[in-house]
């Protein structure tokens, strides 16, 4: 479904949790979906990605530094929140992008990326200020100044 809808403009780079990396099968869509699950440095994948689609992984905290769009594929949010682990933040109110519950919603958000960016711009800024603002390349300088003050 995604290849048919997005394949002319996008490719998908997949980086799963290492526990399930071997289970990912991209047979039949190798020219559209690339399994990078065993690629060591996820930050390099962030740099070449236009959009981050994640679930409950902490990767969005790091990806947010790039100020690029994010989608949160949360098809099982009720179970994850209420039964499995819970969350550190209020996902519905604080995430810097939409929660989507189906592949169709993922596709729709990607097709309407400009509208999504506008809708979540303010929330993204609040999130960035809260979680990313001191990650500005000057952390060592601040640490030295604090220690040798």
What are these regions (language model features)?
Residues 1-3, 60, 144:
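Short amphipathic alpha-helical segments and helix-helix/interface helices
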Residues 47-58:
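Acidic donor-binding loop of glycosyltransferase active sites
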Residues 14-16, 54, 74:
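Short beta-strand/turn micro-motifs composed of small residues
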Residues 25-31, 58-131:
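Catalytic binding pocket for nucleotide-activated donors in carbohydrate/polymer assembly enzymes
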Residues 1-36:
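Catalytic donor nucleotide-activated moiety binding site of glycosyltransferases and closely related
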Residues 136-149:
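C-terminal alpha-helical cap of glycosyltransferases
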Residues 42:
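Acidic, amphipathic alpha-helical patches
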């Amino acid at each position: 479904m995604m290849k048919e809808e997005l394949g002319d403009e996008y490719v998908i780079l997949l980086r799963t949790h290492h526990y399930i990396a071997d289970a990912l099968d991209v047979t039949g869509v190798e020219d559209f979906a690339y399994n990078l699950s065993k690629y060591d440095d996820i930050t390099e994948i962030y740099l070449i990605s236009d959009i981050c689609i994640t679930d409950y992984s902490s990767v969005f905290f790091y990806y947010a530094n790039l100020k690029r769009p994010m989608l949160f594929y949360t098809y099982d949010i009720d179970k994850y929140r209420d039964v499995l682990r819970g969350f550190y933040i209020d996902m519905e109110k604080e995430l810097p992008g939409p929660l989507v519950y189906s592949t169709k919603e993922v596709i729709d958000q990607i097709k309407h990326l400009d509208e999504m960016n506008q809708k979540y711009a303010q929330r993204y800024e609040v999130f960035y200020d809260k979680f990313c603002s001191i990650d500005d390349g000057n952390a060592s300088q601040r640490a030295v100044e604090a220690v040798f003050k």
